[in-house]
């Protein structure tokens, strides 16, 4: 079995089945999703705790990224996508017709596999979302930029070149810049879709350390193909297979004493 970070082993596991409303960031209820005639998610239900890191793992094509993109309605951009079920944020179904999708995406930020800074300065990348919200006071923008860059553990590396083009940063720095941009508008939830898959090992470690710090302020949900990464950074892990949620428990349980045979087979490398 995969070794677990000692900090994760020392933490008391959360009772996910009886998680209270005040400790729940998101609740997914009986979620089905299909693209045209092909069903990609089958009756997924789970509660995601506040200010914890929850990892989605599973083989390619299992539905983990599809599920992640449901949480801020990115799948709305796919014309053939049909969804049944609910995802509750503050007790409200985010798929309710009355929901302001733009406001939802401000509250549920997302970072993708490859760093995607805008062709602007480092500073303008960070404050971009704030400007869209109508914030133009220079002092407020400066404070927000520094706060966000510090929060993404990159301030010391860029503080003397904030007006340089963001494309001049390394891949790992660009990804931290993108995280800074996401947290600048102070979301409650941060979705990370394979955030280190395009990075070198040193940059990956830096991002992993950042993820464990981010949960002090945000609920973090990460999709990863790297099981060692899930074991290192997450508090809970959900194992998905062929569109179904097979097992969801504290990370220590998933990686050391899984309850389901499919989970054990995947963790031990029998398939995947």
UniProtKB/Swiss-Prot annotation:
Residues 26-267 form the ABC transporter domain. CDD domains: ABC_PstB_phosphate_transporter. GO terms for molecular function: ATP binding; ATP hydrolysis activity; ATPase-coupled phosphate ion transmembrane transporter activity. Keywords: ATP-binding, Cell inner membrane, Cell membrane, Membrane, Nucleotide-binding, Phosphate transport, Translocase, Transport. GO terms for biological process: phosphate ion transmembrane transport. Its EC number is 7.3.2.1. It comes from the Bacteria. It is a peripheral membrane protein. The keyword Cell inner membrane applies. The keyword Translocase applies. InterPro entries: AAA+_ATPase, ABC_transporter-like_ATP-bd, ABC_transporter-like_CS, P-loop_NTPase, PstB-like. PROSITE patterns: ABC_TRANSPORTER_1 (PS00211), ABC_TRANSPORTER_2 (PS50893), PSTB (PS51238). ATP binds at residues 58-65. Signal peptide: none annotated. The complex is composed of two ATP-binding proteins (PstB), two transmembrane proteins (PstC and PstA) and a solute-binding protein (PstS). NCBIfam families: 3a0107s01c2 (TIGR00972). This is Phosphate import ATP-binding protein PstB. The lineage of its organism: Bacteria, Pseudomonadati, Pseudomonadota, Gammaproteobacteria, Alteromonadales. The gene is pstB.
